[in-house]
């Protein structure tokens, strides 16, 4: 059995990790940490978890002794120094601290210097693109939720030079859980209910992550114009992407079917069928649809994911499976919740 620990176990992604790992046939939870609720049983704070493990403050000695893998479900900037204290434990970080090739990009967008970053061997944890590297990784930077939806939607088109990478327009909509479990007026029920609003326009921190990975795929410089929106639902991301092309929809669709033919979690929809966030609710599945706007030679791509599962904790478990030589669908085989 894989001994798994979670730091930040009482945030939304941490709780989702608890749910997934409790139902994983090859893993068991051996360490849970929460600064806010240290000393309490998890089920005292969140009865739905049915988990009687006691939450503790972070203790690197306990982690090294009791864990084979540690999931760090902390805000950006909080994991880096903790991880550097650990030896002999595989790390899957759900924050942004290990996602970037260039620490200067992280410094520019997240405002923190990562001392010694170049000495840490890390892999960007998007299995559909980096499966082989993940197999031997010691530290995995789990992708962000928006980048997961956008990169998977664009990867085949950029890989096969089917679209112009110079300017990619992304309009994305996310459920409120994407903002994390925090007290803020913007996320009160009366503020988000029956409301739709953009946020972090032209300055969202996920943009450089998208451009880094999409640039690797295409081999060219990629420019992403990204506008996220908050919608009154708990889970889910729907990304709609606009990109220029001189190819036919049929050719592009066939390329997508071939690219994702053997991927267990990515589903390319028939032409004329468009994805819904309801289809992936509570699951690790991704649905991709497409249409051509022929007047302007614009390919419109649409992708739907659950931001807490494939966009965070489910993808982290998928990475764990790969790192430990398991079938990557282990513990993730369940179908989405519907309705």
Swiss-Prot record:
InterPro entries attached to this UniProt entry: AGPR_AS, AGPR_type-1, NAD(P)-bd_dom_sf, NAGSA_dehydrogenase, Semialdehyde_DH_NAD-bd
EC number: 1.2.1.38
SUPFAM superfamilies listed in its UniProt record: Glyceraldehyde-3-phosphate dehydrogenase-like, C-terminal domain (SSF55347), NAD(P)-binding Rossmann-fold domains (SSF51735)
GO CC, any one term: cytoplasm
GO biological process: L-arginine biosynthetic process
Pathway entry: Amino-acid biosynthesis; L-arginine biosynthesis; N(2)-acetyl-L-ornithine from L-glutamate: step 3/4
Cell location: Cytoplasm
Catalyzed reaction equations: N-acetyl-L-glutamate 5-semialdehyde + phosphate + NADP(+) = N-acetyl-L-glutamyl 5-phosphate + NADPH + H(+)
Superkingdom per UniProt: Bacteria
Protein's job: Catalyzes the NADPH-dependent reduction of N-acetyl-5-glutamyl phosphate to yield N-acetyl-L-glutamate 5-semialdehyde.
Family statement drawn from the similarity comment of this UniProt entry: Belongs to the NAGSA dehydrogenase family. Type 1 subfamily.
Protein name in UniProt: N-acetyl-gamma-glutamyl-phosphate reductase
Source taxonomy: Bacteria, Thermotogati, Thermotogota, Thermotogae, Thermotogales
Gene name of the encoded protein: argC
